[in-house]
């Protein structure tokens, strides 16, 4: 059974919830909250039109074409309406550095901004959370106490979602090991840059790796400190000798 497309009804159905569609969507700012953001986008798209989620993920409407036997003009109309809805939704819910990346995509679009191009970029680059992005989020933990309570709640929701779901392939023991390693790093802010450089691009982490890395750095810093202390002592001795000769 095929249906007849009513363009006015479709436009009204899709665009009427546009003004408040972003209210319940967690803003996308980093890979840490990509899955939460995507869930919100999919929910809003489903609410706007039952066929829109296919367009979100593929840029096409094969199911709707089949059910409505759409003409080429009707297909183009539907895609334009869906695209407009999603681009506006993305612009409202993508923030921070992620928004800068989206703006680059929009600037390169030469006119018509493609919702699918925006989605594809973040699906490819934000879908896998790295140790670096998780660590960046956890590093904000000491600073969050001064924020309003709703921001604290939102931050903690994002944090614990990330900790619980930091790698779907990992078993429970490995996830726990990774999370303990991440939390350990927050107690050593002096090694922040070194942690990001060493482990930032990794997808998983072993606690033993971090402990070994910390011990090696501690040993290196200790040797450096001893060397610096000896140089400083020599300098003080030299200055004392020099002062005695300048009476």
Curated annotation (Swiss-Prot):
Protein name: Putative uncharacterized protein YCL076W
InterPro entries: DUF5314 (IPR035179)
Pfam assignment, any one: Retrotran_gag_4
Lineage: Eukaryota, Fungi, Dikarya, Ascomycota, Saccharomycotina
Organism: Saccharomyces cerevisiae (strain ATCC 204508 / S288c) (Baker's yeast)
């Amino acid at each position: 059974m095929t249906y007849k497309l009513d363009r006015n009804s479709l436009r009204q159905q899709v665009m009427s919830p546009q003004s408040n569609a972003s209210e319940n969507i967690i803003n996308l700012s980093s890979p840490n909250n990509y899955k939460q953001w995507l869930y919100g986008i999919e929910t809003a798209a489903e609410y706007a039109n039952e066929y829109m989620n296919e367009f979100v993920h593929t840029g096409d409407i094969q199911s709707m074409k089949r059910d409505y036997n759409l003409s080429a003009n009707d297909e183009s109309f539907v895609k334009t309406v869906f695209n407009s809805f999603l681009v506006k939704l993305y612009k409202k819910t993508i923030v921070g550095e992620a928004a800068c990346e989206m703006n680059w995509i929009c600037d390169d679009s030469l006119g018509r901004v493609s919702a699918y191009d925006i989605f594809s970029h973040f699906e490819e680059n934000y879908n896998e959370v790295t140790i670096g992005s998780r660590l960046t989020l956890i590093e904000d933990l000491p600073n969050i106490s001064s924020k309003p309570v709703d921001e604290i709640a939102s931050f903690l929701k994002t944090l614990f979602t990330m900790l619980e779901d930091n790698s779907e392939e990992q078993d429970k023991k490995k996830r726990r090991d990774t999370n303990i390693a991440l939390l350990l790093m927050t107690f050593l802010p002096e090694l922040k840059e070194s942690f990001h450089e060493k482990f930032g691009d990794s997808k998983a982490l072993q606690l033993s790796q971090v402990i070994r890395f910390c011990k090696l750095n501690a040993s290196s810093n200790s040797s450096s400190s001893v060397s610096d202390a000896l140089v400083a002592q020599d300098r003080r001795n030299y200055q004392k000798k020099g002062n005695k000769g300048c009476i």
